[in-house]
From Swiss-Prot:
GO biological process: peptide biosynthetic process
UniProt protein name: Elongation factor P
Pfam families cross-referenced by the UniProt entry: EFP, EFP_N, Elong-fact-P_C
Main location, first listed in the record: cytoplasm
Its biological purpose: Involved in peptide bond synthesis. Stimulates efficient translation and peptide-bond synthesis on native or reconstituted 70S ribosomes in vitro. Probably functions indirectly by altering the affinity of the ribosome for aminoacyl-tRNA, thus increasing their reactivity as acceptors for peptidyl transferase.
Superkingdom of origin: Bacteria
Source organism: Gemmatimonas aurantiaca (strain DSM 14586 / JCM 11422 / NBRC 100505 / T-27)
Keyword Lyase attributed: no
The encoding gene: efp
Locations listed in the record: Cytoplasm
């Protein structure tokens, strides 16, 4: 589907020089007496590289024909992560490079959305929050609820996040995997 460059929006996936690229940021502006343009920061989903490109307002952009499938993470074997398609039970293997920053957040049974372009998986979307147990953190200090300070805590997946002072070791917490921020204590 083709559209004008002025219709570019954040999160949109378009075809640029034959590769699918996600729009990370964009800015529409008209400098002085020049023609309108759209400055966009793009991420190439095939190579993983980020770059900027300036589109003229009259440029025609092609939206990438993407498919999305729900996958369930089964297990990790070395650098390979094994998934099962929840719709047709097909098995799929992705490596560390394909998962990128999402790799440490994988836990058995986790359901993710995989994006496919031309029948090949090119990216995944994690849920907005995941639950992990804190395996290491400083002990609770009396009166810690009076101040809004935080302390580092190591999760069971090895990732370190900042948590409020009142959170102790063994507590299950919800974390936003895209930002690595503590959300709240899990209500199990």
């Amino acid at each position: 589907m083709a559209f004008s460059a002025t219709q570019i929006r954040r999160g949109m996936v378009l075809v640029f020089e034959g590769d699918p690229c996600r729009v990370i940021e964009f800015r529409h502006h008209t400098p002085g007496n020049l023609r309108a343009m759209v400055q966009a920061k793009l991420k190439n989903l095939r190579t993983g590289s980020n770059f900027e490109h300036r589109f003229r307002a009259a440029d025609t952009i092609v939206k990438a024909d993407m498919e999305t499938h729900e996958l369930e993470f089964m297990y990790q074997g070395g650098d390979t992560y094994h998934f099962m398609n929840s719709e047709n039970y097909d098995q799929l293997e992705l490596d560390d490079e394909a998962l990128g920053d999402s790799a440490p957040w994988m836990q058995p049974g986790l359901k993710i959305l995989a994006e496919y372009y031309n029948g090949r998986p090119i990216g995944i979307q994690l849920p907005n929050s995941l639950v992990f147990e804190i395996v290491e953190t400083a002990p609770v200090v009396r009166g810690a609820t009076k101040t809004a300070s935080s302390k580092p805590a190591k999760l069971e997946n090895g990732v370190t996040v900042n948590v409020p002072e009142f959170v102790e070791q063994g507590t299950r917490v919800r974390v936003n995997p895209s930002t690595g921020e503590y959300l709240d204590r899990a209500k199990d």
